[in-house]
Each structure stands twice: as structure tokens, then as C-alpha cells.
């Protein structure tokens, strides 16, 4: 009887932990979906930023697929809590069969400060997101988001890019980047 009572008490103590984990997972899924929808629904894209450099490449992998990478580096201003997310080939959230590449969203927070790095504090020289594709060319809608030092202002820039064997090309529907 004492063993049964001990097991019941132990189980009742573990159940709230499971509920908290489920709540955390739901919150992270909602955050991911919100960013996914923001990227997918953006209608205004720029071709370059005044605040950092974007570059990219796509390479063939031995199994016949392709791996692509988008690199953000060379910050011109202090950028805190940077988030990057790409959505491949205009795939709707409900149709996505894989996680889209992102950094700073569901993982650690990263900051970029010109001419400084401190990996212990997550101050980095650059960020990379990468993904896999069955095709030699991939079209990405990309969001780059960051905050100022006080974290009281947030900035977002959207890009529509194509990666292929020739490198990265930027598509824009704006006449200027202002």
C-alpha cells in the first residue's frame, strides 16, 4: 500500500512538469508560426541593407540534394537579439513539411556589434542560416529583425532572394530602399 501511495504521489508531482513543457512547446510553436506568417505575407522587399551585409551560396551534396547558406555579417551598427528566418519557395505554413531555417528565434539570442565579438555573451561576428533543397535553385523570402541597445525599438527588413550556381540575387518590388 505504501508503494502504491508513493507511486501515485510521484506521478502527481510529475504531471505539472509535463503541462509546463506542453505550454512552452505551444508558445514556441506559436512564435515560429507568427514569424513564418510575417515572412510569407511580406509584400515589400529590399535589395540591400545599410546595416549589414548578406551573402549566400548553394552547393551540391553527395546524395544529390543541395545545401544552401545565407550569411549575415559586417554589421555597421549595434544589432541586439537578431532574428533571421527564411521561407523557401513561397511554401505556405500549412503546407510546410519541414522547419524553415532560422536563428535567434527558437534558439539563443545573438547580437552583432561592429568590430567586437564575445562568444560567451553571444556577441558574434556574423550569423548563418542554412537549409536543404532537392533543387539546384531556391527562392527564399528572408526576414532580418533586431533591436537597439536599449531594446525599446525593433527593426525589420525583408528580402526576396534567389540562390543558384551563380550565387545570390536579390529581387525587389520597391523603387528605392528607403
Predicted feature descriptions by range:
Residues 7:
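Extended basic-aromatic, gly/pro-enriched interface segments that bind polyanionic ligands
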Residues 99-155:
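Short, solvent-exposed, Trp/other aromatic-anchored flexible loops in extracytoplasmic proteins
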Residues 69-73, 83-85, 143-145, 162-164, ...:
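A structural detector for beta-sheet-dominated domains
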Residues 153-178:
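Short beta-strand elements
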Residues 19-104, 109-111, 116-121:
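N-terminal export/targeting and maturation segments
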Residues 1-4:
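Positively charged n-region of N-terminal signal peptides that target proteins for export
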Residues 14-17:
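C-terminal motif of bacterial Sec signal peptides marking the signal peptidase cleavage site
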Residues 54, 66-68, 140-142, 157-159:
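Hydrophobic residues positioned within well-ordered beta-strands of beta-sheet architectures
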Amino acid at each position: 500500500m505504501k508503494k502504491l501511495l508513493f507511486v501515485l504521489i510521484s506521478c502527481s508531482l510529475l504531471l505539472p512538469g509535463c503541462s509546463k513543457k506542453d505550454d512552452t512547446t505551444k508558445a514556441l510553436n506559436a512564435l515560429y508560426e507568427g514569424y513564418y506568417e510575417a515572412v510569407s505575407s511580406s509584400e515589400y522587399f529590399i535589395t540591400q541593407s545599410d546595416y549589414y551585409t548578406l551573402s549566400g551560396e548553394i552547393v551540391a551534396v553527395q546524395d544529390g540534394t543541395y545545401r544552401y547558406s545565407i550569411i549575415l555579417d559586417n554589421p555597421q551598427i549595434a544589432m541586439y537579439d537578431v532574428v533571421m528566418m527564411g521561407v523557401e519557395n513561397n511554401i505556405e505554413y500549412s503546407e510546410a513539411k519541414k522547419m524553415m531555417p532560422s536563428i535567434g528565434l527558437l534558439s539563443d539570442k545573438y547580437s552583432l556589434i561592429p568590430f567586437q565579438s564575445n562568444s560567451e555573451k553571444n556577441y558574434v561576428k556574423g550569423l548563418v542560416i542554412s537549409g536543404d533543397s532537392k533543387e539546384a535553385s531556391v527562392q527564399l523570402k528572408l526576414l532580418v529583425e533586431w533591436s537597439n541597445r536599449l531594446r525599446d525599438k525593433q527593426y525589420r527588413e525583408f528580402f526576396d532572394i534567389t540562390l543558384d550556381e551563380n550565387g545570390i540575387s536579390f529581387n525587389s518590388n520597391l523603387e528605392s530602399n528607403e
